[in-house]
Amino acid sequence: MIATSSRPVRIGSRKSQLALVQTEWVQAQLQTHHRDRAFEVVTMTTQGDNILDVALAKIGDKGLFTKELELSMLRGETDLAVHSLKDLPTQLPDGLVLAAITEREDPADALVLGAKWTGHTIDTLPEGTVIGTSSLRRLAQLRHYYPHLTFKDVRGNLNTRLAKLDAGEYDALILAVAGLRRLGFGDRISQVLPATVSLYAVGQGALGIECRAEDADILALVKTLEHPETTARCLAERAFLRQLEGGCQVPIGVHTVIENGQLTLTGLVASLDGQRLVKDSLTGDVATAEELGTRLALKLREQGASEILEEIFATVRPER
């Protein structure tokens, strides 16, 4: 069923607190731009929400947090979906498109310290300090730069992770700046990690709005939320990831910046143990963002990324 002005536009969202905060922000923005329309949020649980005791890399990541939202749109039950862009696969199902990318929150990673480590930075933590992270990307980079630290998997929503930190299960956590700020935990950030030690995930800090490809009405509504600079940066990042066939199973990091119409993309592929790290940058016109991403991926493949990727896929790809 196509949305009409006579009924509410239905926005699909995961049920998690962060997802709802993000979706309700999109709902409010759409309402501001389109006062003659009504918007309602429809929540649902995704496969990724139900798997809390297994590292995501062990179960694959093709739509773990998006598939149910996408099926709902394809069935005509909802009209659009709001995703953390980093969770949205680079290949979308037939009939769906990435309609808009919103203005990005700081995409960097943050160090969140337990109380007894207050005043430290990542560089001053002593040997054996236990760092919680569920991301292979963060893990590989930090193992590379800080081999003396101890890393331990952590799952659960943001509140759960912070509670585990405060209970002493970890000495520190590595979390996304964006998620912490959106949920009102910005004061827990001990250090924003520099790009020199932690390139961020593709799309981190941005929201992606997905809808049906043929739904011209919804496409037009959603376009009003698009942020051109964020879009160019994220399209370059997603093209880079698509060429590498990566996801949360693979330690792939990026960093993008736009100055004077020129986009500089830095990309990284690391081995799981952090021993090998292939990293390089390219600069080009903003209008060629996706081409730039593809070119950088091919450049990294030539420098050894393909061998690293093959080893990782052989190790962590889930059984079909």
Swiss-Prot record:
- KW Transferase (keyword) present: yes
Relay the cofactor remark from the entry: Binds 1 dipyrromethane group covalently.
Q: Which GO terms describe its molecular function?
A: hydroxymethylbilane synthase activity
Q: Which residues cross the membrane?
A: none
Which of the seven top EC classes does this enzyme belong to?
transferase
Family annotation (InterPro entries): HemC (IPR000860), Porphobilin_deaminase_cofac_BS (IPR022419), Porphobilin_deaminase_N (IPR022417), Porphobilinogen_deaminase_C (IPR022418), Porphobilinogen_deaminase_C_sf (IPR036803)
Q: Which UniProt keywords apply?
A: Chlorophyll biosynthesis, Porphyrin biosynthesis, Transferase
Q: Say which domain of life the source belongs to.
A: Bacteria
Q: What is its EC number?
A: 2.5.1.61
Q: Name one GO biological process term.
A: protoporphyrinogen IX biosynthetic process
What cofactor requirement does the entry state? dipyrromethane
Q: What are its GO cellular component terms?
A: cytoplasm
Which biological pathway?
Answer: Porphyrin-containing compound metabolism; protoporphyrin-IX biosynthesis; coproporphyrinogen-III from 5-aminolevulinate: step 2/4; Porphyrin-containing compound metabolism; chlorophyll biosynthesis
Q: Which reaction does it catalyse?
A: 4 porphobilinogen + H2O = hydroxymethylbilane + 4 NH4(+)
Where in the sequence is S-(dipyrrolylmethanemethyl)cysteine found?
C248
Check the record and name the HAMAP family matching this protein: Porphobil_deam
What does this protein do, in the record's words? Tetrapolymerization of the monopyrrole PBG into the hydroxymethylbilane pre-uroporphyrinogen in several discrete steps.
Q: Which family does it belong to?
A: Belongs to the HMBS family.
Subunit note = Monomer.
- Extra information: The porphobilinogen subunits are added to the dipyrromethane group.
In its UniProt entry, what is this protein called?
Answer: Porphobilinogen deaminase
